[in-house]
């Protein structure tokens, strides 16, 4: 039994000389990283619940220094909007005064 053990040890030493990375198989695992005790836990996030806005109660407010215009600028259209609907799709199409065709497809 000692002869077999000696042969295994001899082969292991030869392999470690040829392949030094095999020595990493017997190194201990590095300790797990743990934060120092003086670290404070992160603050809890504030969760705000949204409520639906009733158009009659709360109109949207715009800040005075806001760069957003109060009304949206939509170019005038040459022809009225056409609406086509199927059971799951609504297609609305129109043409602007400069010839651009605008199509809106809504999948229900």
Swiss-Prot record:
Key words, A-Z: Early protein
InterPro entries according to UniProt: Papilloma_E4
A family per Pfam: Pap_E4
Family according to the record: Belongs to the papillomaviridae E4 protein family.
Protein name: Probable protein E4
This protein's encoding gene: E4
């Amino acid at each position: 039994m000692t002869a077999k053990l000696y042969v295994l040890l001899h082969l292991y030493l030869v392999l470690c000389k040829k392949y030094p990375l095999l020595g990493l198989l017997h190194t201990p695992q590095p300790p797990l990283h743990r934060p120092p005790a003086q670290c404070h836990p992160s603050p809890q996030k504030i969760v705000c619940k949204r409520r639906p806005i009733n158009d009659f109660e709360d109109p949207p407010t715009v800040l005075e220094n806001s760069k957003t215009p109060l009304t949206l600028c939509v170019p005038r259209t040459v022809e009225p909007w056409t609406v086509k609907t199927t059971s799951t799709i609504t297609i609305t199409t129109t043409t602007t005064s400069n010839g651009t065709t605008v199509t809106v497809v809504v999948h229900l």
